[in-house]
């Protein structure tokens, strides 16, 4: 197995590149819970710090960063509402990024899947799993404070509408929303790019400022990341 040669900072807060002696480079985050991995990712020790490899094929946010994402508003201390947390792959890396000063409110609909999420969160005091349906934020509004970012990955035909509805409840003014759009969940007959543009137009018409629309191929086929600012 190749050995770590150095770790360098990226343009984004608490996101790093691990460079190995065989010339390969991998995205990584500092492990908030040393000794524990989440989805079988490699743990890398360098300079007295443990990092977790961040697999771009397992995380849409990692894929977006590798693809050249320009706007990543997630920083140390950010408060995040994550819709569609699943078993915690991407939320755990966000947990690393925001550190203990931040919070990751992690909403998941499946009782089976949230059991896995709870196992992840027990080692991460800044993660707060919530068993709920993202279509009905009124049922978890007492559990979530106003947040800096709403991150959405729920693969529903009305994902954009669900995202905007949650933003009305929880997103601070001048906060950001990041939406992972799966075009095939919206319309299998249309060209994915046409769908991305249509979803961005919905957001713009609702008063959001479009910062970026980034296609995620080859890491996630027929997906795009849309980043908007709440004016």
From Swiss-Prot:
Enzyme Commission number(s) from the entry: 2.1.1.-
Keyword tRNA processing among record annotations: yes
A biological process term (GO) from this entry: box C/D sno(s)RNA 3'-end processing
InterPro entries in the cross-refs: Fibrillarin (IPR000692), Fibrillarin_CS (IPR020813), SAM-dependent_MTases_sf (IPR029063)
SUPFAM superfamilies per UniProt: S-adenosyl-L-methionine-dependent methyltransferases (SSF53335)
Record carries keyword Magnesium: no
GO molecular function: histone H2AQ104 methyltransferase activity; RNA binding; rRNA methyltransferase activity
SMART domains with a match to the protein in the record: Fibrillarin
Residue ranges the record marks as coiled coil: none
Key words of the record: Methyltransferase, RNA-binding, rRNA processing, Transferase, tRNA processing
Disulfide bridges in this chain: none
Binding site for S-adenosyl-L-methionine: 89-90, 108-109, 133-134, 153-156
Subunit note: Interacts with nop5. Component of box C/D small ribonucleoprotein (sRNP) particles that contain rpl7ae, FlpA and nop5, plus a guide RNA.
Family label: Belongs to the methyltransferase superfamily. Fibrillarin family.
NCBIfam families: PRK04266.1-1 (NF003275), PRK04266.1-2 (NF003276), PRK04266.1-3 (NF003277)
Function: Involved in pre-rRNA and tRNA processing. Utilizes the methyl donor S-adenosyl-L-methionine to catalyze the site-specific 2'-hydroxyl methylation of ribose moieties in rRNA and tRNA. Site specificity is provided by a guide RNA that base pairs with the substrate. Methylation occurs at a characteristic distance from the sequence involved in base pairing with the guide RNA.
Identification of the protein by name: Fibrillarin-like rRNA/tRNA 2'-O-methyltransferase
């Amino acid at each position: 197995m190749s050995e770590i040669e150095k770790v360098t900072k990226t343009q984004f807060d608490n996101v790093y590149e691990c460079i190995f002696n065989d010339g390969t480079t991998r995205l990584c985050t500092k492990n908030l819970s040393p000794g524990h991995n989440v989805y079988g990712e490699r743990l890398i020790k360098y300079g007295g710090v443990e990092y977790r490899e961040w697999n771009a094929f397992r995380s849409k946010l990692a894929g977006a960063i590798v693809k050249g994402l320009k706007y990543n508003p997630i920083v140390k201390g950010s408060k995040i509402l994550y819709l569609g947390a699943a078993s915690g792959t991407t939320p755990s890396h966000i947990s690393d990024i925001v550190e203990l000063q931040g919070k990751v409110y992690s909403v998941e609909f499946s009782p089976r899947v949230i059991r896995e999420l709870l196992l992840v969160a027990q080692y991460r005091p800044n993660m707060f799993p919530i068993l709920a349906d993202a279509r009905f934020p009124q049922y978890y509004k007492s559990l979530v404070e106003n947040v800096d970012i709403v991150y959405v990955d729920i693969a529903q035909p009305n994902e954009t509408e669900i995202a905007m509805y949650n933003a009305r409840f929880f997103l601070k003014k001048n906060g950001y929303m990041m939406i992972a759009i799966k075009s095939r969940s919206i319309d299998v007959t249309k060209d994915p790019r046409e769908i991305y543009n249509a979803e961005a137009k919905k957001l713009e018409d609702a008063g959001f400022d479009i910062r970026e629309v980034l296609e995620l191929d080859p890491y996630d086929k027929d997906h795009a990341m849309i980043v908007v600012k709440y004016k």
